[in-house]
């Protein structure tokens, strides 16, 4: 979760109080699974909306897992975005059909603060419920990145977000 510089300032509260407040903030997002649907013509939206949350989650001691569709994350982009390079793990999925199961397993372990996976199809209610349950068990956040085909109209209104292709090399 993004907090302003004012909220991140030093305070006179004892360390245990500060740690309890930080843990409460981090736990507020636990169990969250959100789908980010994007169009190719909106490359900056994901950076504007997701990066503050990813930076905040990067302050935890746990990993951030990116399940990407055959592209490799750019080391330079990770560093320039303010994400903790030493906590970012990436697995390039050769078969997109395995992304859902990989996300569920990773979320459930509790080893990751966030798991980001790319899917080509809309999730069923049952698949979404499985992800939410796994995120709750692992006290984690899941993001499903899903491109919308230009010729296909979504069944319901979605937000349009995209992580720009310059993130990969």
UniProtKB/Swiss-Prot annotation:
One of its GO terms (biological process) is negative regulation of cell division. The record marks 169 as: Essential for degradation by Lon protease. InterPro entries: Cell_div_suppressor_SulA, P-loop_NTPase, SulA_CellDiv_inhibitor, SulA_enterobact. The keyword Cell division applies. The keyword DNA damage applies. Pfam families: SulA (PF03846). Residues 162-169 are annotated as: Lon protease binding. Is rapidly cleaved and degraded by the Lon protease once DNA damage is repaired. Residues 106-112 are annotated as: FtsZ binding. It comes from the Bacteria. Induction: By DNA damage, as part of the SOS response. Keywords: Cell cycle, Cell division, DNA damage, Septation, SOS response. Interacts with FtsZ. Component of the SOS system and an inhibitor of cell division. Accumulation of SulA causes rapid cessation of cell division and the appearance of long, non-septate filaments. In the presence of GTP, binds a polymerization-competent form of FtsZ in a 1:1 ratio, thus inhibiting FtsZ polymerization and therefore preventing it from participating in the assembly of the Z ring. This mechanism prevents the premature segregation of damaged DNA to daughter cells during cell division. Belongs to the SulA family. This is Cell division inhibitor SulA. It comes from Salmonella typhimurium (strain LT2 / SGSC1412 / ATCC 700720). The lineage of its organism: Bacteria, Pseudomonadati, Pseudomonadota, Gammaproteobacteria, Enterobacterales. The gene is sulA.
């Amino acid at each position: 979760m993004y907090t302003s510089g004012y909220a991140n300032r030093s305070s006179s509260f004892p360390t245990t109080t500060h740690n309890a407040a930080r843990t409460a903030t981090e736990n507020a997002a636990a169990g969250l699974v959100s789908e980010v649907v994007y169009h190719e013509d909106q490359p900056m939206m994901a950076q504007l909306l997701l990066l503050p949350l990813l930076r905040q989650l990067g302050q935890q001691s746990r990993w951030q897992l990116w399940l990407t569709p055959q592209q490799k994350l750019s080391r330079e982009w990770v560093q320039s975005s303010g994400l903790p390079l030493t906590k970012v793990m990436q697995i390039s999925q050769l078969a997109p059909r395995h992304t859902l199961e990989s996300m569920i397993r990773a979320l459930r372990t509790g080893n990751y603060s966030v798991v980001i996976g790319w899917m080509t199809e809309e999730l069923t209610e049952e698949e979404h419920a499985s992800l939410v349950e796994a995120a709750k068990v692992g006290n984690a956040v899941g993001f499903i990145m899903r491109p919308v085909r230009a010729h296909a109209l979504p069944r319901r209104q979605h937000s349009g977000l995209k992580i720009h292709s310059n993130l990969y090399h």
